[in-house]
Amino acid sequence: MARVVFRDARIYLIQWLTKIRHTLNQRQSLNTDKEHLRKIVRGMFWLMLLIISAKVAHSLWRYFSFSAEYTAVSPSANKPPRADAKTFDKNDVQLISQQNWFGKYQPVATPVKQPEPASVAETRLNVVLRGIAFGARPGAVIEEGGKQQVYLQGERLDSHNAVIEEINRDHVMLRYQGKIERLSLAEEGHSTVAVTNKKAVSDEAKQAVAEPAASAPVEIPTAVRQALTKDPQKIFNYIQLTPVRKEGIVGYAVKPGADRSLFDASGFKEGDIAIALNQQDFTDPRAMIALMRQLPSMDSIQLTVLRKGARHDISIALR
């Protein structure tokens, strides 16, 4: 009996010790896994810290060691040179890199306008450029439908949806339907007044009265006076001057404008040919340009016209 009890007790003890050992082994395995995981996390942390430190150190090194030499050469300098490209000496490049681009201001001369490229086509609009004047307010005398009008740069033509883009010495540039077109100064063939012989006009002028009777400035309608006071160049809205040509300008035919009140009030007649302006020869092509340039500062103008062989002076008050 005692042997049986002792045997059972020993078996029970062995089983109990086995369970304890198994439990201890499980705990030890768990602790080992946790230790491995802890080491892995610690290693990743130090690796990330090392990478971040390297990036920061590299950025600081680039910042403090940055030199102006890196900006002296354009990225395009590394490209292979073109066949038609000009070569530059290294000294020239170094000289350019040493310039103080934001230094003391130096006045820049107004660039001279270059001739328009040949690709700009002549306009097909039914308008004629009769004259051009330069000055503080460049203007162009343009004839539309038989009527002359003075336009400044940036203004729109009355009869067409075209804008005066530029005013040059012998032409103007128009912007029409999104395209740039050229309107050249009218040549002899564009004149609307026929002259059979320049000598005949000259002879007629010689046979005219030597000293025409000067007329006092006429009284013009109030509305016209107010318009001329604001802009004397609007006189061409009331009086049209069309060049009479025969191997050059021999005068200007005087015609009424859209509003003929000033034409009638001033005493002009159909067929009058203006040959002088303020006692200056009006047959010189530069006379019209001088007139348009001086108009803003004039208080009155005096036109000398030929009428049936006689000369008549007609004065017009602009203010």
From Swiss-Prot:
* Localisation per UniProt entry: Cell inner membrane
TM spans, by residue? 43-65
Membrane topology summary: Single-pass membrane protein
Which GO BP terms sit in this record? protein secretion by the type II secretion system
Please give the residue ranges for the topological domain Cytoplasmic.
1-42
Membrane topology, Periplasmic segments: 66-319
Instruction: Please name every pair of cysteines joined by a disulfide bond in this record.
Output: none
Q: What keywords is this UniProt entry annotated with? A: Cell inner membrane, Cell membrane, Membrane, Protein transport, Transmembrane, Transmembrane helix, Transport
Q: Name one GO cellular component term.
A: type II protein secretion system complex
Tell me what else is known: Encoded in a type II secretion system (T2SS-beta); this strain encodes 2 T2SS but only this one (beta) is expressed under standard laboratory conditions.
Q: What does this protein do?
A: Involved in a type II secretion system (T2SS, formerly general secretion pathway, GSP) for the export of folded proteins across the outer membrane.
Which family, according to the similarity comment? Answer: Belongs to the GSP C family.
Quaternary context: Interacts with outer cell membrane protein GspD2 in the periplasm.
Q: What name goes with this protein?
A: Type II secretion system protein C 2
Species the sequence originates in = Escherichia coli O78:H11 (strain H10407 / ETEC)
